[in-house]
């Protein structure tokens, strides 16, 4: 538990710094639309879906390494990078488990 918490913290810190850097870099492009956050959410959600599929479909990592990679990169970095990726992953997991009505209810409650 302690190592996983540390991995999430390290990944989350770097993800938050990356989000801050992207929002600062795009701040002068658009004053009306929060372009940086929009890009973070789009990029992060795309990567989180690709990482989830990659970790599920490939046998590149054993289960222990896959867990560490997931906590560092998906939960940590992408969770810190986006404000939407954790929600997307929750919906993806519910749909993969066949819990369609719970996923719809979750979307309705959060929206």
Curated annotation (Swiss-Prot):
Annotated transmembrane regions: 2-22, 36-56, 71-91
Family annotation (InterPro entries): FluC (IPR003691)
Regulation of this protein's activity per its record: Na(+) is not transported, but it plays an essential structural role and its presence is essential for fluoride channel function.
A GO CC term attached to the entry: plasma membrane
A single GO molecular function term of this UniProt record: fluoride channel activity
Residues involved in Na(+) binding: 79, 82
Top-level lineage group: Bacteria
Disulfide bonds: none
Subcellular location: Cell inner membrane
Annotated catalysed reactions: fluoride(in) = fluoride(out)
Membrane topology classification: Multi-pass membrane protein
KW Translocase (keyword) present: no
GO BP term (any one): cellular detoxification of fluoride
Stretches assigned to coiled coil: none
Assigned keywords, A-Z: Cell inner membrane, Cell membrane, Ion channel, Ion transport, Membrane, Metal-binding, Sodium, Transmembrane, Transmembrane helix, Transport
Function: Fluoride-specific ion channel. Important for reducing fluoride concentration in the cell, thus reducing its toxicity.
Family: Belongs to the fluoride channel Fluc/FEX (TC 1.A.43) family.
Protein name (Swiss-Prot/TrEMBL): Fluoride-specific ion channel FluC
Organism: Francisella tularensis subsp. holarctica (strain LVS)
